[in-house]
Amino acid sequence: MKITDLKKNMGSFSLEIDHLVIEPGKIHGLAGHNGCGKTILLKTIMGILEPDKGTIDLEGLDRRSMTMMMQRPYLLHGSVYENIIYPLKLRNMEVGEAEVDRLLERAGLLAQKNQYARSLSSGERQKLSFLRAIIFRPEFIIMDETLSNMDPDSEKIITDMIKEIQETDPVTWLIVTHQTQRRDDLCDVIHYMEKGRIINETA
């Protein structure tokens, strides 16, 4: 993905990205203080917001193969299982129940499979949101502060699963987190934002 001369005005705030390359199959981090424009950039990449100027070249990537996780997951009224398979129904896809059970067990949620999703703890909800994001095998996954305010065990499960995915069938990630150690441990490249602009990147 290549972003060139991107501009998006949001009242008194202006997002201006001269050049940004998101390499496929890599874990990219996006860092910066609150209010620097990270979420606006992510929503523009996802097509939720329309840019005022510039281009986002997806280089053949289908937006239907992209997904975005927020800090506070939105869960459906229904069971844990129903929440996981919801993205599959939207895309007319099928995954065997054995695969769903495997993911639930890996995330420590198999015992809660038939419980109402909204009865889960905050950490369990984030793990469920993560499983729902990966179940349809997207090519591009955005995580906007998904790892924030999580208990250490849940955070470790998610980060370990990200690493496992990258070892077997790499996808592209764009991860926003204020946790410096976790970001440095996970990411291949980190892009730093300030006042709506990319000011630096490290690999």
Where are these regions (language model features)?
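Q-loop/switch helix immediately C-terminal to the Walker
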Residues: 78-92
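Conserved ABC ATPase "signature" region
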Residues: 95-112
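Helix-to-loop junction immediately C-terminal to a conserved catalytic motif
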Residues: 46
